[in-house]
């Protein structure tokens, strides 16, 4: 009757194609001679789609959670050095059961010295990219490491047009280290590709570790921290335009605002 094929979440009744293979839009995952899924690292952009779509947990990204715990413990309550948490703007949509200020307080309870918004780095990047766009006329963003990797691997002819600016994560981390010689920076966001970005030569001096929101929740759970019971901490450094980077079209809006503030009224922004 076909009812089983309709309800099987893995399409196992009518197809042997793995969920991870279906999830990979750039076709970096194929079946090897043993019918096992294999990832072509020359094509993979580390977007994490396969990780989230695999129902069996067979694919995992590298975790730095133990490195972060070790970093905090060895800081001696931030006496030897200061451990900063840089949080992505999308954190407000991840911890929907609590207020952002409560998450900030929770981060302090975990042992972080201070919490900074990646959105503040986004403000800096939007300002710089708006200038660069007007100068060059055509530009692709350097904010998303997965997108940058995709251009480099699939469209190498566009590589010269990638913005020369660091991402918001790296930009705010560099700012923190320029103003605090003892700073160690941990980025916390939704994207597994950020872990690969943190390991890049041009980013490594600024970002010491990167974690996902799921790993942050694991840290809260391990310390039995109920963030809904905490007071709200303050976090108000970034602008509206820096915070909307996380939504579709947010980067274009922020760059458009930067162009406007710099007085380039003659320049017409055509975002695609």
Where do the PLM segments sit?
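Iron-sulfur cluster-binding cysteine motifs and their immediate structural context
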Residues: 2-45, 49-65
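Iron-sulfur-associated redox domains of electron-transfer enzymes in respiratory
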Residues: 55, 60-272
